[in-house]
Regions:
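Surface-exposed assembly/interface segments
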Residues: 1-173
Length: 173
């Protein structure tokens, strides 16, 4: 605990001495919106998605916003998402894995998943890094908060354990 949350922390700690569950509720202002990244051609406007159920049920036009924060508030403004595709820089604007700033968070370059390879396809894999761009979350700017290796851009892709390997499904969880 810190001096800003010691009363709340200790109240919760004492409560948990006699119980094994505690619900924490976060209040947001009525004008709070979710952070989001807009594609270069997108026209989306900020919106409020107040809980996980609303987030999962939201229909967001992918042509407008590439990513949207799960909860409203300004903390998400510090998030950055960086994606590296399976194709090395071939003139299409895809980031070359060897020159990618977040290469050290992944074991190898993305390529072709076994699922897509089995269907005769190739180059479906991407790596996704979620970064604390401003240091508001981790305390250190540029910290990789989450690394999602070898995801697929194929919406029907499956991992070896049978679960979805589609990047939107994996990141949403």
């Amino acid at each position: 605990p810190t001096t800003t949350n010691t009363v709340d922390f200790h109240s919760a700690a004492y409560f948990l001495r006699y119980s094994n569950t505690l619900q924490v509720v976060r209040e947001t202002d009525s004008d709070a919106k979710n952070s989001f990244a807009v594609n270069s051609f997108g026209t989306a406007t900020a919106q409020a998605i107040n809980n996980k159920t609303a987030f999962e049920n939201a229909t967001i036009d992918s042509s407008d916003g590439a990513f949207i924060g799960r909860f409203p508030g300004s903390l998400g403004n510090s998030l950055q998402v960086s994606i590296c595709g399976s194709s090395d820089s071939d003139g299409s604007g895809v980031i070359n894995f060897n020159a990618w700033a977040y290469k050290s968070s992944f074991d190898a370059a993305p390529g072709t998943s076994s699922y897509v390879s089995g269907l005769g396809g190739k180059n479906d894999e991407i790596h996704v890094a979620v970064i604390d761009e401003d240091g508001e979350i981790s305390g250190t700017a540029g910290t990789v908060l989450e690394a999602y290796p070898f995801l697929s851009v194929a919406s029907n892709a499956k991992a070896t354990d049978g679960t979805s390997n589609y990047y939107k499904d994996v990141i949403r969880e």
